[in-house]
Amino acid sequence: MLLNHATSSIAGLNESIVAGVIDQRIRDAYVTILSAVTEICKGHLGHPVPIVIHGYDYPVPDGRGFWGGGLFPGPWLEPGFRRKGYTQMGKRKQICVKLIDRFNTMLEGLAGNPPFEHVKFLNLRNTLLTDATYKTWWENELHPTPKGFQAVTKKFAAII
């Protein structure tokens, strides 16, 4: 849905779908939640409380899922890339960077601007490495290792 086929004349992200999903639907969901929390706090405390919102780091879509199962054990990203003809890891990572940047830009645009002056944006991009050592930072396609969580935790501690 978000991704055109690699052999298509319009390969890469489907801009109109990405805009509709991130810039409209997901943004609207964040506005709804932030507005509700803000109004509840104003009603009960007389003022909004500080809120931290955060995006994601750049994942490595290598097909590693969550060991131990669960409802959604993964892999989450690699199968979609494979079905759409993206076999090269470099191209997959480039597409993930564009998508994650778009999501983070949307969040950053909400934080600190009316009516969300009390909302701070935490940028987690480039916290976890995606180079040859990425498996020491990423447990799977979406979740950090303990070492990765320590790096993320330091960023949260700094903003709180």
Q: Where are the predicted features?
A:
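Hydrophobic, aromatic-enriched interface-forming segments
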Residues: 24-78
